[in-house]
UniProtKB/Swiss-Prot annotation:
Catalyzes the reversible transfer of the terminal phosphate group between ATP and AMP. Plays an important role in cellular energy homeostasis and in adenine nucleotide metabolism. This is Adenylate kinase. It holds the Pfam family ADK_lid. It is found in: Cytoplasm. Zn(2+) binds at residues 130, 133, 150, 153. The keyword Glycoprotein does not apply. Belongs to the adenylate kinase family. It is an enzyme of class 2 (transferase). Pathway: Purine metabolism; AMP biosynthesis via salvage pathway; AMP from ADP: step 1/1. Keywords: ATP-binding, Cytoplasm, Kinase, Metal-binding, Nucleotide biosynthesis, Nucleotide-binding, Transferase, Zinc. SUPFAM superfamilies: P-loop containing nucleoside triphosphate hydrolases. Residues 126-163 are annotated as: LID. Consists of three domains, a large central CORE domain and two small peripheral domains, NMPbind and LID, which undergo movements during catalysis. The LID domain closes over the site of phosphoryl transfer upon ATP binding. Assembling and dissambling the active center during each catalytic cycle provides an effective means to prevent ATP hydrolysis. Some bacteria have evolved a zinc-coordinating structure that stabilizes the LID domain.
């Protein structure tokens, strides 16, 4: 199956992507991982992307799209793929559709994991990280034995700058502004599968399976 995975920060996309990867035996293609691999291998597009990333600039669509195409022709994508982090805009979605069509292919579905904003805020702002060993906790869902202290090494736990309420709200605003047109684009094409991501993790993957016509009991 050829799939796209959408969802805001904190929606649990990584967890669900691993489940989908295992159940459908298709590669999980994260844009971030794809950039890092292309840069590491020193491909022409990877070198172009590196210039923009090192300069703190957005990688242009033509470079990103080229990298995606480069990745999707690899042998492990013969039976499908799960794209995560691409497309981000309608222009990218149109480019992907056009390229797939030129190969006689099309997307099978777009999975949109939806979680209420207050739940996302709780998930993200509650994260704590050990400044010494990097172990991660959550004040509600995975608290340390001693509040504020790492179970592994006893050092202080801190909240990352990315996880403050102001920063999380900004990230969610940017995501919603950027993704709303994309969601509408795929809804109009009958590809969108909206999934309640506020359920327990096992329930979410079962819901994804049902949306794809699979019985993953």
């Amino acid at each position: 199956m050829r799939l796209v995975l959408l969802g805001p920060p904190g929606a649990g996309k990584g967890t669900q992507a691993r489940e989908i990867n295992q159940r459908l035996a298709i590669p999980h293609i994260s844009t971030g991982d794809m950039f890092r691999e292309a840069i590491k291998r020193g491909t022409p597009l990877g070198r172009q992307a590196e210039v923009y990333i090192k300069g703190g600039r957005l990688v242009p669509d033509e470079v990103t799209i080229g990298l995606v195409q480069e990745r999707l022709v690899q042998p492990d994508c013969r039976n499908g793929f799960l794209l995560d982090g691409f497309p981000r805009t309608v222009a990218q979605a149109e480019a992907l559709d056009s390229w797939l069509s030129s190969r006689g292919e099309r997307l099978d579905a777009v999975i949109d994991i939806e979680v209420p904003r207050d739940a996302l805020l709780e998930r993200l702002t509650g994260r704590r990280v050990c400044r010494q060993c990097g172990a991660t906790y959550h004040v509600r869902y995975n608290p340390p034995a001693v509040p504020g202290k790492c179970d592994a090494c006893g050092q202080d736990l801190v909240q990352r700058a990315d996880d403050t309420e102001a920063t999380v709200n900004k990230r969610l605003d940017v995501y919603n502004e950027q993704t709303a047109p994309l969601v509408n684009y795929y809804r109009q094409r009958g590809l969108l599968k909206e999934i309640d991501g506020s359920q327990a993790i096992p329930a979410v993957i079962l819901a994804i399976g049902r949306a794809l016509g699979r019985d993953w009991q």
